[in-house]
């Protein structure tokens, strides 16, 4: 996660102690732990045609005003209503008239200073650019058949194959054949093709065979001005404003609050009908700015961690870090996740910089989600950008994942064992034929669990296994952050030929998709996308980020390989053992001579597989390698950059040749 804005690093006049004199609502707290906690839901608006009730938790406020507007932007409030302080620091009021179609904001007075308009921390509908909350008829936001929408079945997290995408990347290019380019609705269009008459869009996803689409941040964010969408500005969206509203820039009309809501639901519904689950990228670890954030304008200081000198902690690297351990921030995060599940039928969550959050909060989120549906996935980045202002042993870091059952993290060990150090793009590793990364790759192959043949003292980043179960590890070689795969190969192997790049691209993803754990693919890798060598394209133009769908034709061989590789994994449970003991019993590394060669055996019909024994070998040398195998008659299904489950010939052992810069898979 990266964004490039400059942020205020000082909290300003707000301190932990808040004293308000000469006020009928004077409150004095010596620590954030003493702030009252609102009971029940954090709902801030309840509408009926006869009256609308408003609520705002702001325990340190001297006064709170409700501002009513006719429009989502511009103009002045047509009515101002003074709110009354109720229980547990919650201010309330009721407006006894029909407010449908109106907009509202709150303004909080603290230490004799009005903080400025905020839609609250929990708005569910907003006007353009999210400055004001909207009062809408929610029944009009449900597409036809929404009540019968169901998430596709999923037996185990090991069965997941995640496809990470950005809305604009996936559909905005002129070659996509998609009408609603860069919009939620792009993922509802069937029958779209490129110039070679090959499927694009949602049909492409079905053809590829992925099970989950991971959407980069899709809740309301700051960096795109929704009033200037014709200027085609781009951003990943890791600068959150309103956490519980879809972003308007991906809708066909950001001025109408119901449009973004309905179109987001249409997208989810279409993906579900196509057999694909939907994962949201959520960014609870920081806000776009601090002093003007909805959190800060509502309860100054409370939602952020501070250093001892009162300045903002910055574990996110973006100017602030949220305080997930505080009761109301924890409550907010739990309710937010549950809201996206209930209202939008979301099937999973990827937590940006999850290492900023505390373990207890993440476990409470997992427990709350389990009560709805335990197959809803939760995974995240098991690290932070800088050291958070919280005890390290209580943070949701990768090394602590054993204390978070049912939550997964990305394996940078496998990624960098294959590609090289992510921050040193010219340095290669296993794929580049650089020796020394083999044990890190093996660590990823077993799913980051304890395995008798994996020596963690030779693993790049972890001196001990951190996963209790292989399904706590996400395996990948590329994502939106850093270089995409082909750019990484070019940077670390400047002399590589186009043919070698293709071979190594296939080899890399074969490691990912035959490893235990949860495989993850960056959108466009299946057609060998590039981003012109840019490793932080968070605000680069479409010319850099968009998938050129002509590549599906020119790189058809690569797409076919990915498709067949995915099908191979889905068809054979040996590659999807969700249990650590099963992995230790059935996965055995074979002895090899020299470096840059890794081989393993999935034996004894692992996980009930129809294949009795499976041999998998990865050779990153430029020359063929000899591999000793158990004697038997094997059918080759992957060799020299080609996959065909019908067979590519047979081998009998006790020795087999593994072609250079490629994978070999065979079974008996």
Residue ranges and their predicted role:
Residues 48-62, 588-628:
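Carbohydrate-binding surface patches
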Residues 56, 106, 165, 215, ...:
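Conserved, mostly hydrophobic/aromatic
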Residues 58, 101-104, 648-668:
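C-terminal beta-strand-rich structural cap/linker in extracellular carbohydrate-active enzymes
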Residues 25-49, 85-189:
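The feature marks proteins involved in alpha-glucan
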Residues 553-582:
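Catalytic cores of secreted or luminal carbohydrate-active enzymes
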Residues 168-344, 357-373, 377, 388-389:
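Substrate-binding/active-site clefts of carbohydrate-active enzymes
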Residues 19-21:
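C-terminal motif of bacterial Sec signal peptides marking the signal peptidase cleavage site
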Residues 129-136, 366-367, 371, 375-528, ...:
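Conserved alpha/beta catalytic core and glycan-binding cleft of carbohydrate-active enzymes
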């Amino acid at each position: 996660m990266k964004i490039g804005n400059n942020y205020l690093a000082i909290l300003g006049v707000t301190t932990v102690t808040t004293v308000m004199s000469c006020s009928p609502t004077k409150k004095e707290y010596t620590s954030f732990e003493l702030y009252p906690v609102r009971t029940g839901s954090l709902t801030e608006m309840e509408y009926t045609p006869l009256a609308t009730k408003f609520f705002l938790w702001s325990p340190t406020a001297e006064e709170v005003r409700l501002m009513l507007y006719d429009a989502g932007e511009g103009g002045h409030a047509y009515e101002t209503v003074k709110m009354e302080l109720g229980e547990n620091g919650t201010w309330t009021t009721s407006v006894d008239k029909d407010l449908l179609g109106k907009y509202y904001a709150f303004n909080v007075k603290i230490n004799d200073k009005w903080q400025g308009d905020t839609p609250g921390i929990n708005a569910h509908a907003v006007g353009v650019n999210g400055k004001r909350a909207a009062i809408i008829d929610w029944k009009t936001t449900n597409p036809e058949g929404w009540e019968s929408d169901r998430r596709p079945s999923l037996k185990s997290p090991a069965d997941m194959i995640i496809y990470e995408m950005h809305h604009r990347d996936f559909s905005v290019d002129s070659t996509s054949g998609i009408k609603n380019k860069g919009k939620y609705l792009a993922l509802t269009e069937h029958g779209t093709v490129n110039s070679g008459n090959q499927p694009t869009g949602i049909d492409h996803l079905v053809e590829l065979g992925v099970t989950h689409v991971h959407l980069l941040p899709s809740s309301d964010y700051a960096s795109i001005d929704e009033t200037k969408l014709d200027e085609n500005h781009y951003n990943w969206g890791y600068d959150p404003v309103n956490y519980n509203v879809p972003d308007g820039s991906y809708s066909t009309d950001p001025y109408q609050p119901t449009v973004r809501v309905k179109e987001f639901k249409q997208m989810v519904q279409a993906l579900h009908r196509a057999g694909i689950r939907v994962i949201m990228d959520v960014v609870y670890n920081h806000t776009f700015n601090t002093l003007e954030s909805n959190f800060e304008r509502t309860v100054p200081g409370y939602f952020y961690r501070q250093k001892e000198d009162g300045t903002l902690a910055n574990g996110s690297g973006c100017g602030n870090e949220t305080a997930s351990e505080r009761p109301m921030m924890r409550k907010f995060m739990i309710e937010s996740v549950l809201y996206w599940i209930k209202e939008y039928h979301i099937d999973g969550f990827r937590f940006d910089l999850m290492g900023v959050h505390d373990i207890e909060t993440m476990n409470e989120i997992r427990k709350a989600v389990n009560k709805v549906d335990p197959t809803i996935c939760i995974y995240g980045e098991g690290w932070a950008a800088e050291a958070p202002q919280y005890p390290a042993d209580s943070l949701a870091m990768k090394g602590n994942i054993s204390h978070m059952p049912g939550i997964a993290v990305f394996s940078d060990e496998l990624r960098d064992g294959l590609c090289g150090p992510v921050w040193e793009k010219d340095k290669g590793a296993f794929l580049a034929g650089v020796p020394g990364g083999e044990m890190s790759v093996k660590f990823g192959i077993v799913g980051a669990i304890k395995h008798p043949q994996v020596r963690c003292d030779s693993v790049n980043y972890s001196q001990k296994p951190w996963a209790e179960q292989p399904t706590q590890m996400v395996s990948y070689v590329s994502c939106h952050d850093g270089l995409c795969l082909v750019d990484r190969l070019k940077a670390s192997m400047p002399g590589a030929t186009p043919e070698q790049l293709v071979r190594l691209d296939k080899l890399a993803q074969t490691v990912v998709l035959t490893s235990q754990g949860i495989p993850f693919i960056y959108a466009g890798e299946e057609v060998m996308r590039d981003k012109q060598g840019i490793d932080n394209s968070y605000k680069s133009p479409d010319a850099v980020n968009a998938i050129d769908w002509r590549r599906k034709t020119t790189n058809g061989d690569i797409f076919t390989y990915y498709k067949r590789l995915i099908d191979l994994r889905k068809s054979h449970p040996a590659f999807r053992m969700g249990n650590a003991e099963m992995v230790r019993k059935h996965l055995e590394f074979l002895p090899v001579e020299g470096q840059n060669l890794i081989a393993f055996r999935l034996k004894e019909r692992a996980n009930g597989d129809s294949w009795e024994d499976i041999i998998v070998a990865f050779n990153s040398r430029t020359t063929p390698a000899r591999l000793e195998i158990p004697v038997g008659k094997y059918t080759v299904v992957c060799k020299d950059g080609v996959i065909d489950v019908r067979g590519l010939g047979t081998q009998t052992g006790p020795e087999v040749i593994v072609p250079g810069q490629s994978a070999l898979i065979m079974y008996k």
